[in-house]
Each structure stands twice: as structure tokens, then as C-alpha cells.
Amino acid sequence: EQYDADSLRYYLSINMPETHDTDFRWDEYVDRVNNELIGTYGNFVHRVMTLTHRLECDEGNPLSKYDGFSDHSKILREVDNQISNAIESMEKQRFKEALRSIMGIAQIGNSLLQEAAPWKFINEDESDERSTSLSSLSLSWRICSCLAVCMRPFTPFSSDRLWGMLGNQNDIDNVLWEDSMDVGTNL
């Protein structure tokens, strides 16, 4: 009752014995949950949601006008590569490996946000620099959608909550991992 089921599922998945025995250690559980699940995944999602909420918009998603403004083909290839690696790992029942690839997507998102620094442009007038930065935030929104879908086997309750916070009405279970960047993003 003291710990969220998803954090326990995450720890058990990332620490599960695939080739050798393993022990459950509370200190390692706390460390992995704080540094990986919260520090990488949770921090990225929180930043995207908070920054998007701070944008003024009359109706709909405030990021929709920035979607595709900048060329993010390199980032998209990196994310697609991580998704492909995760799918391949899941098919081979290498769940830890799959989870590492998915967490790699969150790391890509964090790097994208850090480089774009959209918090600097939230209250600025329209400019190419602002649009470029907010285009990265828009892509980060898509990455959150991808993470909700791909993390579903490991953190189902959190994934459902994130899917809903992103404004998605369709069933998350009907979205293929390889389509998760483009489906249900409400941009």
C-alpha cells in the first residue's frame, strides 16, 4: 500500500533475472525508481506538460501551430531506432533490454527539451527562434504519447493516466508501438 504498483512493476521489470538470480533490495528499488522512473521518465513528462500548460491558447492544443515547424528528422530517427530495438527485445522476451530502449526515448526527449529551452520563449513574441523552440516542445508532446504506449506493459496505470492527460480519446491498447508518435497526439 505504501508504494505505487507501477513503480514496483518498473523495478521488477528492470531488475528481473534473465540469465542469473537476482535479489530484491529496497535501497536499489528506491534508487532505480527515483533516478530512472522519476528522474528520467517522470521529469520529462512533467516538463512537457507544465510548459505546454503555460502556453496561451484560445482552443485546442497550443502546440498544434508549431508541429512540424522545424526539421527534427535526426531526433525522429533516434526515437524510431529505440522503438525498433524495444519491439525486437520484446519479441525475444528480453524485457529489461526493451525497457532500457524505452527509457532511452525519454532521455532523447530530455536532451531535446534541454537544447531547445522552450521555457525561455513561453512569454515571448512570435519569432523564428521561438517557433523553432516550441516545435521541439511539440515533438516532445509526441514523444510523451510514444512513451505512454511503449511503457504500458511495464507501467499500465501511469500510462493510462498520461494517455488521458495528453487528451487522447482512442484506446491506448489499439496503438502499435511503431505508430505511437503519430497516433492520438491531439496536435
Mark where each language-model region is.
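Aromatic-residue-lined binding/catalytic grooves and analogous aromatic/hydrophobic interfacial grooves
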Residues: 57, 95-96
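Basic, alpha-helical terminal appendages of large translation-related enzymes
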Residues: 88, 92-94, 103-187
